């Protein structure tokens, strides 16, 4: 029973994801049925929140979305349970096809009503891990096929602290923005600060703090602050 159900669901999942997706036949039927019920409920929530949209996200239980008009999603987008998305911003929040926002993750684009933030643009097939924070006031862009671990934080805003006679909170903020290229892997509990420009194919080690600067493609970066540890290279058979 479970193997047959896994085969059937694999076909549906492959069609929905536009790629081969094979479910482990050892997973019990009860577990698979629970997943199916949960996914159907997420689809229904998305339909209720965005009844007139051609593409609607699947929305988990207790997820909250503010400024829905500023949220644009592609096909097959999932917003996990307990996630919080406040899309109020100049460019809005744009989530590409088959992108996932993990459980408990917060996306906030505007820190003050005095000035709208820039927003968040995410490519296709991107995984934003669970329990993470994306502060997008200065703009955050993430390329296709990037995976971002759990408990990661992005902060695209800096406080001005040049004067000693004025409280820091009254000196204003600066925004340089953050860019993460395509095909990157950002490890769990990493912190990415305003002004960081991470090239395609990079790996950021767990717990690293990525400060403002340019990080060339295919580098492996780690530490506090993050520095180049090594450069990824094609294996001999691929290079040939």
Regions found by a protein language model. Name each.
Residues 1-56, 145, 151-152, 156-164, ...:
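Terminal amphipathic alpha-helical/low-complexity segments used for targeting or macromolecular assembly
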Residues 49, 75, 170, 177, ...:
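Short secondary-structure boundary/capping segments
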Residues 57-58, 76-77, 221:
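Well-ordered beta-strand segments characteristic of repetitive beta-sheet solenoids
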Residues 62, 84, 209, 220, ...:
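Conserved beta-strand positions that form and line the central face of beta-propeller blades
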Residues 64, 79-192, 224-225, 232-233:
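Flexible, glycine/small-residue-enriched loop-and-beta-strand segment within the central core
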Residues 70, 177-178, 196:
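Short coil-to-beta microelement around the adenine-binding A-loop and adjacent beta1/P-loop entry
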Residues 197-222:
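C-terminal/domain-terminus segments
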